[in-house]
Amino acid sequence: MNTQMVAGFDGAQLAVHSVGEGRPVLLLHGLFSSAEMNWIGFGHAQVLADAGFRAIMPDLRAHGQSAAPHDPEAYPPEALARDAEALAEALALEPGAFDLVGFSLGA
């Protein structure tokens, strides 16, 4: 398991966990959760890695190991979508070259 910090749309630091090699699958967790709770702890990420995929699991802002800014301006309605775009860009995930999976808040 690899963990790195990546800047969200406004520079907030987001923890991004990854495991495996192959076609990237970006996994977005649910509300009041984290990558550990939704994807790592239950083994979903490892199943994907074992099947030849690269599971990429950010902790969404204010969740898990990611920053939780106190400024309300850090949470516009489109914050999660903008963070996902920033992550894809930072990780060089080209449109059509990765799969996106969301659960609850991440959907």
What are these regions (language model features)?
Residues 23-30:
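Short beta-strand element of the alpha/beta-hydrolase
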Residues 78-96:
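Conserved acidic catalytic loop of the alpha/beta-hydrolase fold
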Residues 67-81:
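Catalytic nucleophile-loop/oxyanion-hole region of alpha/beta-hydrolase
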Residues 9-19:
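A short loop-to-beta-strand scaffold at the N-terminal edge of the catalytic core in hydrolase folds
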Residues 102-106:
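Gly/Ala-rich beta-loop-alpha elbow adjacent to hydrolase catalytic centers
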Residues 32-45:
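The serine-hydrolase catalytic nucleophile loop
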